[in-house]
Amino acid sequence: MEPLAWLASAHHDQLALCDSLEAIADSLPEEINRETCAYAAKMIGPMMRALHAGEEQRVFAWIEQRFADDASVHALLERLKYEHCEDECFAEELTEMLDRLGAADRTVNAETAGYMLRGFFTSVRRHISFEQECLRSMLVRRPGGTPR
């Protein structure tokens, strides 16, 4: 699959995850769907790791080939890789909290859980928007509006 098409699909999957996490946050504290929480706990870490690995191997490598002489592009990709690492660490924390919600653990503070969920999905959405904007900008910079 072409790198940008793959990235569009990955972004679609991540945004769907964000929508699910937002629904969980909106259900707190009274209407928690424990099954949804347990499923999200199982999915979030592996999904984020797989999508980030694919993005770095397919898309970032593709960009690096086309912009090999551009230090600003390399700096941008390093920033995005760092954000991937941060998102994966945050996903681990969410996994623990979602597991506890899924198991009906009454010691989970609903307000804290809501802040954690909202912080994560807001950050992921912002990251996706930034990536899309940067890619559009990079592609326009090439003569003829396409990468070489």
Where are these regions (language model features)?
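Small-residue-biased structural context
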Residues: 1-148
